[in-house]
């Protein structure tokens, strides 16, 4: 497997603080991504932010993760992800189709207590933020690890995640694995449903998950849930 197929970045904190130019107004359409760690990845070096990105009419084949957002403490207060839309996407044999990881363990200090602590820390100049994300009209078949894995910072929760008209099913011979590159989670997960932690507003509408082991959704730290079946 190679690296991420498409990676959108805007630099580490020294670059973001100096130039303050986010990656913005990006359109990705009619692309086929295959055999990568992530199909479309935002971050983790995004200290100037990523805003107003739309990905539509794409196909993902045999990647570890499909729509992947990765950040961590230390990226800075200008490291804001906002206005993100993923729509009309088909996936086949993607291990975990949707990932938001606020504890990405990159860089020499990636495994440090500061980066990996799951308890709320003080919000300061180093704290990144994830605002509004929308996943709409997406089908993923032959998944392995998890339907979706969303883990925000406890001190700076993800503001809003919308999932609408989503269909997910698992491979019969699904193999276990780790849904996100972070410490403190099970590395042998298989056929998990939707895992959601530390989100202010989570909107689920017309979500179909077939063949998961356990509950369809596991939640903690969700301030508001709108579930329209």
Language-model features: locations:
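Extracellular/periplasmic carbohydrate-active domains that bind, remodel
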Residues: 1-229
């Amino acid at each position: 497997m190679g690296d991420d197929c498409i990676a959108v970045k805007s630099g580490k904190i020294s670059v973001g603080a100096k130039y303050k130019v986010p990656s913005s107004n990006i359109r990705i359409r009619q692309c086929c991504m295959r055999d990568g760690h992530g199909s479309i990845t935002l971050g983790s070096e995004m200290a100037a932010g990523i805003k107003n990105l739309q990905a539509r009419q794409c196909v993902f084949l045999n990647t570890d993760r499909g729509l992947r957002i990765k950040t961590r403490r230390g990226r800075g207060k200008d490291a804001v992800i906002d206005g993100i839309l993923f729509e009309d996407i088909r996936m086949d044999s993607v291990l975990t189709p949707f990932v938001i990881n606020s504890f990405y363990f990159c860089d020499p200090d990636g495994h440090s207590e500061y980066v990996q602590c799951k308890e709320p820390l003080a919000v300061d100049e180093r704290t990144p933020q994830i605002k509004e994300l929308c996943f709409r009209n997406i089908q993923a078949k032959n998944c392995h690890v998890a339907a979706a894995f969303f883990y925000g910072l406890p001190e700076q929760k993800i503001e809003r995640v919308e999932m609408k008209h989503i269909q997910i099913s698992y491979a019969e011979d699904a193999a276990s694995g780790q849904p996100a590159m972070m410490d403190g989670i099970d590395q042998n997960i298989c056929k998990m449903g939707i895992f959601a932690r530390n989100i202010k507003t989570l909107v689920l509408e017309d979500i179909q998950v077939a063949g998961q082991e356990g509950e369809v959704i596991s939640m903690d730290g969700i301030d508001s849930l709108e579930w329209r079946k």
